[in-house]
Regions:
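Walker A/P-loop NTP-binding motif
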Residues: 18-29
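Conserved RecA-like ASCE ATPase "motif II neighborhood" in helicase/translocase motors
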Residues: 69-141
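Conserved helicase/translocase motor-coupling segment
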Residues: 19, 163-164, 188-248
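Conserved Walker A/P-loop ATP-binding site and its immediately adjacent core
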Residues: 34-53
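The conserved Walker
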Residues: 11
């Protein structure tokens, strides 16, 4: 089967860490369950690649093996990539991706169809590209004949730059193009900051949708001794006076 999961969490709850844990724990080439962690945040990817490269060299030495930093970096780059490099690779290559599991960090920042088409035409010289970024990325994993998993790590209200679609673009892509995929959603995706309520309702009418409380990370690791802090801030931003007063 093919499944797409949406993981939500308060700021600092560790969504990126969850994605990295999945990616690093599923590297078994023999079992065919390798994963790739994808992010559009280049500074983050650079830091992660460097840190994991150094760690790989140290671990190999502790195990009595020798590996150069260049060799270690190549292995790390296989499972932590810039999302645009991944996209460009499978524009050129029509085969199914090497990985069966793809984790998209900050999935809400994927591009709309208009932004993606414009970029492909102006920067890549591709005039017949007609997908939003979520549509194309899901289509890559959909090339697998047996199974595939997409994990979207979602930050609420964190669409920052021009053309960033929000999580509704992913939900619309599933509804319109990949309705045979099973969908697992954090119930918190209904919250106002995700602006996805209407898209979820449409998706429920057409697709196999299941809600799972475990897909929400509720406590910020930055303030783990004040577990209600994030909820308090949310209630204030939602102008929920009663809830804010109670929590305060």
């Amino acid at each position: 089967k093919k499944i797409i999961c949406f993981v939500t969490g308060v700021p600092g709850a560790g969504k990126t860490l969850v994605g990295l844990k999945v990616a690093t724990e599923h590297l078994d080439k023999d079992k065919g369950n390798t994963s790739v962690f994808l992010s559009g945040n280049k500074p983050l990817v650079d830091i992660l690649q460097e840190a994991l490269t150094r760690d790989r060299v140290i671990q190999e030495r502790l195990n009595g093996s020798k590996i150069t930093k260049k060799q270690a970096r190549e292995s790390v780059k296989a499972f932590i990539q810039i999302i645009h490099h991944y996209r460009d690779e499978y524009l050129r290559d029509p085969k199914a991706p090497y990985d069966h599991v793809a984790i998209f960090d900050e999935a809400q920042r994927a591009w709309t169809k208009d932004q993606t088409v414009k970029f492909m035409h102006q920067k890549k010289g591709i005039s017949n590209f007609q997908y939003s970024e979520p549509e194309f990325l899901i289509s890559c994993l959909n090339r697998h004949q047996d199974w595939a998993v997409v994990i979207c790590l979602v930050g609420g209200g964190q669409e920052i730059n021009t053309g960033e679609a929000g999580i509704s673009e992913w939900l619309s892509a599933i509804e319109n193009q990949f309705s045979d995929w099973e969908t697992r959603i954090s119930p918190n995706l209904f919250d106002s900051e995700y602006a996805a309520q209407t898209s979820i309702e449409h998706l429920k009418q057409k697709c196999n949708v299941e809600f799972n409380d475990s897909l929400h990370l509720s406590v910020s690791m930055r303030s783990f001794r004040a577990e209600y802090l994030s909820k308090l801030i949310k209630e204030i931003l939602d102008i929920n006076e009663n809830a804010s007063f109670t929590l305060n």
